[in-house]
Amino acid sequence: SLIRKYGFQVFGFDPTPRAIAHAETLRCPNLTVYQLGVSDKSGTAEFYLPNDPHHVSGSLLRESHVGRECVTVRFVTITELLDLIGRDRIDLLKLDIEGAEYKLLHSVEFAALAPKISAICIEFHHRWPGIGGHATLRAVRHLRSLGFGCAWRSIASNEEFTFVRCSN
């Protein structure tokens, strides 16, 4: 709806085959979707598909709801993402990377690029076994140390957050 309402140019990155197939049906000229994941490291990795055929989200982490099937997918770093789309900054970075957000946020590369990001919408996956709420608290503190302030948080789920740049 941001594309229709405001004419935004949107770049999407998703390694999930079903998500790519859906994006192709939209036929939207201001939407460019790449069948790539975003991670703290570039390369290829096993990406675990959802066990429920009605679900779309897979993960790099093998959890109880994913993992019966997997595909090998290509991942890029945020620096490579910017190079690919020909931009030097990100106005809004939306991350829903199914548990891989913690490594990405704590990477040296993310810290170096943080001043070039104006806002971040992120879904944290602390409900997953082996992650826990402490990982999200640590990530929020880290984002604050990088100059971001929390502008919004979902009270219902306590998993979706929006951060905006407050300082460099």
Regions found by a protein language model. Give the residues of each.
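Phosphate/nucleotide-binding beta-alpha loop and adjacent structural elements of enzyme active sites
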Residues: 1-168
